[in-house]
């Protein structure tokens, strides 16, 4: 009866030894890179085995785990996948990921993972957050203010067109809310822009003071309090032109008439051929 107990003890001991022997370490909690440049994410691991597999995964804001690249320990040649490549040093137990020509879509959390050849369980590192800074051409920083036409206590400030080196910080005023820096990528126009939004319900809220805790360029354009955008003016600018609508309807009607004439001629021709 002692044999089953011994076997269970052996299994538990083996599992504990495996969990203690295999570790994955990522020493870079966060890395940043300028768009189109190269960045390297480091990863080290500890194992007593000689046959195993290594992986790099990326986790975008959607939280989905996406396999980037894998490396078999028995292969001496480093794995490559388009712009992604690894530097695998088996003796040093190092497995770094190199990303060339960084794109905005590369921004994500990257996880290094280890898997034994005899165990399907993946062991992950803590992850490295990669931030890709857009390459802004000819930045022209400006702050615009929009007030609600129905309530003077509601105001929104848009800080836009600033370079990637500018950091946007939260306001010390608890009544002022500022979003994180976001990137507008208009690929059809080959144009990128950084932007951040601040808002408050305070009646004395002014855009000139909204970003006081952020280091912004000295040449940033600020509107005067009298020149803030009015919602009614914005809505009016999008009103349709009656004459333009009539012309569009006329063109559509003319095209329909031409199609009917062409269809009638085709029908008469077919009837003549059939007779």
Swiss-Prot record:
Gene: TRA
Designated name of the protein: T cell receptor alpha chain MC.7.G5
Chain positions covered by the region annotation CDR2: 71-81
Cellular component, GO annotation: alpha-beta T cell receptor complex
Alphabetized GO MF terms: signaling receptor activity
Function of the molecule: The alpha chain of TRAV38-2DV8*01J31*01C*01/TRBV25-1*01J2S3*01C2*01 alpha-beta T cell receptor (TR) clonotype that displays pan-cancer cell recognition via the invariant MR1 molecule. On CD8-positive T cell clone MC.7.G5, likely recognizes tumor-specific or -associated metabolite(s) essential for cancer cell survival, triggering killing of many cancer cell types including lung, melanoma, leukemia, colon, breast, prostate, bone and ovarian cancer cells. Mediates cancer cell cytotoxicity in an HLA-independent manner. Has no reactivity to healthy cells, even stressed or infected by bacteria.
Bridged cysteine pairs (disulfide): 43-112, 157-207
Biological processes annotated in GO: detection of tumor cell; response to bacterium; T cell mediated cytotoxicity directed against tumor cell target
Segments for region (Connecting peptide): 229-250
Record bears the keyword Ribonucleoprotein: no
Carbohydrate-modified residues: 78, 167, 201, 212, 248
Segments traversing the membrane: 251-273
Keywords, in A-Z order: Adaptive immunity, Cell membrane, Disulfide bond, Glycoprotein, Immunity, Membrane, Receptor, Signal, Transmembrane, Transmembrane helix
């Amino acid at each position: 009866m002692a044999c089953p107990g011994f076997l269970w003890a052996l299994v538990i001991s083996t599992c504990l030894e495996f969990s203690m022997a295999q570790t994955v370490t990522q020493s870079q909690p966060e890395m940043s890179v300028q768009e189109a440049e190269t960045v390297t994410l480091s990863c080290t691991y500890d194992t007593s085995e000689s046959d195993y597999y290594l992986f790099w995964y990326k986790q975008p804001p959607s939280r989905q785990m996406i396999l980037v690249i894998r490396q078999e320990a028995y292969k001496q040649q480093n794995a490559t996948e388009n712009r992604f490549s690894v530097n695998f040093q088996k003796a040093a137990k190092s497995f770094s990921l190199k990303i060339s020509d960084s794109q905005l879509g590369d921004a994500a959390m990257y996880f290094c993972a280890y898997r034994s050849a005899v165990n399907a369980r993946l062991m992950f590192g803590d992850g490295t957050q990669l931030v890709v800074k857009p390459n802004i051409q000819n930045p022209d920083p400006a702050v615009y203010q929009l007030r609600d036409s129905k309530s003077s206590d509601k105001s929104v400030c848009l800080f836009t067109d600033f370079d990637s080196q500018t950091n946007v910080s939260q306001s010390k005023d608890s009544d002022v809310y500022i979003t994180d820096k976001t990137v507008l990528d208009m690929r059809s126009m080959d144009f990128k822009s950084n932007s951040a939004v601040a808002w408050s319900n305070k009646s004395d809220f002014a855009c000139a003071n909204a970003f006081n805790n952020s280091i912004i360029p000295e040449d940033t354009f600020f509107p005067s309090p009298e020149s803030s955008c009015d919602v009614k003016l914005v809505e009016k600018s999008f009103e349709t032109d009656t004459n333009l609508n009539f012309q569009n309807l006329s063109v559509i009607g003319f095209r329909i008439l031409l199609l009917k004439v062409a269809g009638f001629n085709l029908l008469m021709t077919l009837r003549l051929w059939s007779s």
